[in-house]
């Protein structure tokens, strides 16, 4: 963006913030803008090719804003024109061959990787404010002919100069550089010849980089006079310079040296360590980097006491010795390292276990220790690298430079270290003797096995080091360790517990082929905030923890990763006490169901269940997640699962659509359904598809149940009504059938001619027995010469009463019912009356069989409807209960019976 554009934009924004009406202050703004339009000519060209940005975000007035112009990688052949507000310009990676005319206000200039052919003598004369200049990898190279003496004379404020890959002279351009009296940092190609006396004029020089990292450095040997004229430097980088030797005294003049990097000089080897350490003991050294000073392939290397013993009285804070094929460290070396050491790195080596491991506790102020990437594979093409592995021999574990007195001191230090942990129990150490026999040496170590660590150690890297052990019960020495990275090893059994690690906050045990995680492994790791157990085989082990014992003490844990662990099922209580958990990552497992209890994890923010086999979440889990989402911005990642969108789990899709939880579905995430031609539907179309499910999955169960109930009720009412309506017929048919097919015999059987055995069956109540057995038997049976059936006399004992009644009525020509109040109140009397009715209807073809005798007057309210029906439709006779009436009564009674 052009500076004018930025300025106008600020004006408009300011006007919008302050205006109270449509045209307020418009005239004033126009008069304010017009004088600035002359800037347009200066940025017409550059605005098409450069990107401008403000250096300070707090700048509010465009005319006073300092700008940065990024014109890199624009294929420019000449520099654009810039106004004085531009103070930083990047013209790198273009095709500019003439040094441009730049604004006087310029502070920072990068014109690297351009084919600059010539510099005018006064090219930098007007850039008196310039503080930083980079001319890296100039295509044609800078020669004494085009970078002449005095060209930098006006750059009195320049503090940083980078000429790497550009200066092609055989020596350092001392005459050119000596004018830069304020120069603080110089980066230039390393030359065989050291720095001359003219460099002493640059008193401010503190940082010197002659490495070949981006430039070109070819120096065979560094000697005592190489840096004699730049003895004020504090930081020195001579890495990647093809060095083969560094002589004693090289750094002895640089008494203020704090940082030294001699890395990536593969032909140096550890032979030069003694020379370096001797020189550095008189300096202020704080950081020493000796990475890859051995070639890649070869036998393992060793560091001896004499290599580093002179460092013991220095102020060294950092020591880097990576990629040196380091296999072992002589006992006592670590004891000679200074107490000020805070960071040590020996990664990408081939360290084996040795007694030196016990000496790490002497590094009392060490905060960071990196021994990662042990036995790492390398590019086979490195076998062609030049090597200088010649190492002076040693006798009985000592260097030729090591005196007998030094050996005695080292052994005493070692013994003090071994006996530091005194205990009643003994720890056995096996040591091979010269005749290959094994002897047991007893040392007073406690059990469980002690692991000494530096007391102030905070971060330890053991990752990718081919450590092949079960983590059993260990007691860690006094420490302040907070982070342990032990991924990519073979800790196949996490048994534990690891005692005295209550302050540990981060633990990474990923990719360790671990198959077992005991329920007490984390018992003492109560301060953990982040645990990573990815790429293991813990699915079977975790599935057994039904009580949730594994993580029970991790009350402060915030981040838990268990990806790629072949987990098929997780117990409900597995996260029982993780009340502080914020992130749970279970991605890329074999989970089909997720029924873990989450209601106690109120601060949960992210759950990753991606790439499992989950079809839906249980209702209980959905309710718990919704409750958590009320107090936190919860995200649940369900991508890559076999989600179902059918009628059976319509509630799950509805929950996804309506919940406030973010699910992070991508554009191509789908769920399986039978309501789509493709068998899948995009999760992004969840709202629309939910309507499809509602339409296709509408339940008619309630309607069906309701109609079924109504139908059953109606059918029941109808059946009951029919049964009630024909109850006597059914009873009659039942007992007739029962008597016929169940072996019952009749009282008397009909004659072959169809005559009945009895002339009449007399139905009466027991209370009216006198009338029936005395009066009727005398006046009807005897005088009328008729045969009557009385139940007191003619029923066959042992048979059902109902069967006897049915048979008696069936074998009698008439049925005489003696009606009285007692008769109406008798169940069996009413039964006999109704069976008589059925007999006349169904067996006698409508013949008048039933005859009523009203023995006494009864209240109409007590007479059943069925009796009323008979009285209304059939003739009956009332008993007169007087002498004259009796004669007529008995005669009228005998007449219908005998008919």
Curated annotation (Swiss-Prot):
Task performed by this protein: May be involved in the innate immune response.
Compartments reported by the entry: Cell membrane
LRR repeats: from-to residues: 83-103, 104-126, 128-150, 155-179, 181-202, 203-229, 230-253, 257-282, 313-336, 338-360, 363-386, 468-493, 501-524, 526-549, 554-577, 579-601, 602-624, 631-654
Family membership: Belongs to the Toll-like receptor family.
Tissue: Expressed in all tissues tested. The highest expression is in the hepatopancreas, with moderate expression in the gills, and low expression in the gonads, adductor muscle, hemocytes, and mantle.
Name used for this protein in its record: Toll-like receptor 4
Domain TIR: 756-897
Transmembrane segments: 703-723
Lineage: Eukaryota, Metazoa, Spiralia, Lophotrochozoa, Mollusca
Superkingdom, taxonomy of origin: Eukaryota
Residue positions the entry lists as glycosylated: 25, 75, 83, 93, 129, 137, 146, 168, 237, 256, 275, 313, 388, 432, 463, 516, 633, 637, 668
Coiled-coil features, chain-numbered ranges: none
Induction: Induced by lipopolysaccharide (LPS) exposure, where expression increases significantly at 3 and 6 hours post-exposure, and gradually decreases to control levels by 12 hours post-exposure. Also induced during the nucleus insertion operation used in pearl culturing, which involves the implantation of a round pearl bead and a piece of mantle tissue from a donor oyster. Expression is highest at 2 days post-insertion and gradually decreases to control levels at 5 days post-insertion, maintaining that level until the end of the experiment at 20 days.
Pfam assignment, any one: LRR_1
Extracellular-side segments: 47-702
Signal peptide (from-to): 1-46
UniProt organism field: Pinctada imbricata
A single GO cellular-component term on record: plasma membrane
